[in-house]
């Protein structure tokens, strides 16, 4: 998958870490974070490699967690 911008996994993981919602955050905020986590895992999986299947599973789990939070 060609991307117009260079993907730097370390920068993306660091940003995700620092934007993680704290205790008491609204469900919508936490769900949005899980969606961002899912997108990151999808991008990692798109680069292929031996962990691609596991990364896709993590993306799916993140999206499902977000869906449940939005539904509550």
Where is each model-derived feature located?
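Long, non-catalytic architectural segments outside compact domain cores
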Residues: 1-72
């Amino acid at each position: 998958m060609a991307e117009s911008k260079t993907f730097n996994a370390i920068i993306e993981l660091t940003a995700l870490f620092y934007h993680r919602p704290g205790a008491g955050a609204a469900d919508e905020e936490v769900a949005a974070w899980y969606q961002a986590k899912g997108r990151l895992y999808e991008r990692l999986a798109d680069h292929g490699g031996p962990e691609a299947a596991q990364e896709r599973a993590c993306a799916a789990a993140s999206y499902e967690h977000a869906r449940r939070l939005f539904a509550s």
